[in-house]
Structure formats: structure tokens, C-alpha cells
């Protein structure tokens, strides 16, 4: 099962948590979920050049807190913060709650699956060989500190008449191990021959503690350059 299912969904409440972190009554749930989808889609379109990895949305009482993880925060913030104010005003149109906007810099984009997938897709759109783009992404991730990475590309590769799938892997990528810290993302490259799909899995180590926030905490420590805390057992067995 671990080979087929989305590795992030499989690890929810084990060592991963959701990107939308709020609770709502049944009558409000659909509207709030639609707000989240619209805001995420708008942010990815508006800040396409900023290298947006993920958007976390939290909803404390009568407020909406949006946290954007990006490799190039200066593109979103703009000169003297002018662009971020424009973005805040545009996002406020999607929700009735008071909006708070935070920007978090990703210091090691080579270890972020979403940014790696988008980089490979953009290279293929610029007519770079798909094999060269895959190999470059894999080598950069392993050089920065990934324990394993796998990249899949599917479609009319190289303009071939028949679509096919090719993949490249280095290191270990244990998809069936729940304690494995696996980052996963997809992207698409629009080429003259059609759309080429890109999938990326990055293995960053193991998380032995049972904590849904463990991945985010480990990611923050790695981006700040601090040594990750050593894994601990969840409970001592009797």
C-alpha cells in the first residue's frame, strides 16, 4: 500500500499534520474550505516567481492566519513591504475574517519536494532534456543532505509519439515505513507535445516520536541550520 498511496496522507497524525488547521461546524465547513482553496490557488498564481512551497491556513477565533513558505520572500514582500500589503488586501476579499499574513523563508529549497518538482517542470518547459533536469534535481538534493530521492516523469518525453514513464533514484526512499520522514509533491510541465507530470519523493530521515507536528518542527530546525533533535521513543515499553 505504501507504494501507491500519497505518502503525506498516509502519515497524517503520525508525524505529519494538515495544511488547513481549523475546526468548523457543519454549516460553515463547506464555505471555509472553499475559501482555503481559492486563497491557495490565488497565492500560487500571484506569487508564481516566488517559489511557493506550501500555504498553511489557521483560523483562531474570528481570524484567519495565512503562512506562506517561500524560497524567495523578497519577491512577495516587495520594496519596503509594498507588495505584501497589496497581497494582504487581495486575500482579504476571499474571507470575512480578519486576515493575518506571515512569510516564512525556505533556506534549503533543494530539500523541498514541491520546489524540486517545480524546478524540474520549469526546466522541461525551457526545452532542457528531462534526463538532465531529473539528474540535476537529484544530485542537488543529495548534496545538501537528503538521505534519498526519487523523481518520476510521465508523458510524451522528448516528443515521443507514445507516452511513457521514466524515473531516477538515489539513496533510500522507504515509502512503506511510517516513521520515515518523506516529503512528496507533484507538478506539471506544459510543453508543445502536451503536459508532462512530475512527481518527487525526498527521504530526510526517520521520526521515532509519535507527534503530528514532528515534521514541521524538524523542517524548521533544518532550515535554520540547527542540528535536528535526536529521535526519542514515544513511550518506554513495560
UniProtKB/Swiss-Prot annotation:
CDD domains: KH-II_30S_S3
Keywords: Ribonucleoprotein, Ribosomal protein, RNA-binding, rRNA-binding
Keyword Electron transport assigned: no
Record-annotated KH type-2 domain positions: 39-107
Annotated segments matching region Disordered: 212-238
Pfam families xref list: KH_2 (PF07650), Ribosomal_S3_C (PF00189)
GO molecular function, a single term: rRNA binding
Compositionally biased spans, kind Basic and acidic residues: 212-222
GO CC terms in record: cytosolic small ribosomal subunit
Gene Ontology annotations of biological process type: translation
Cysteine pairings via disulfide bonds: none
PANTHER family to which the protein is assigned, alphabetical: 30S/40S RIBOSOMAL PROTEIN S3, SMALL RIBOSOMAL SUBUNIT PROTEIN US3C
Main function: Binds the lower part of the 30S subunit head. Binds mRNA in the 70S ribosome, positioning it for translation.
Quaternary organization: Part of the 30S ribosomal subunit. Forms a tight complex with proteins S10 and S14.
Family per record: Belongs to the universal ribosomal protein uS3 family.
Protein name, UniProt field: Small ribosomal subunit protein uS3
Organism, scientific name: Cereibacter sphaeroides (strain ATCC 17023 / DSM 158 / JCM 6121 / CCUG 31486 / LMG 2827 / NBRC 12203 / NCIMB 8253 / ATH 2.4.1.) (Rhodobacter sphaeroides)
Gene that this sequence comes from: rpsC
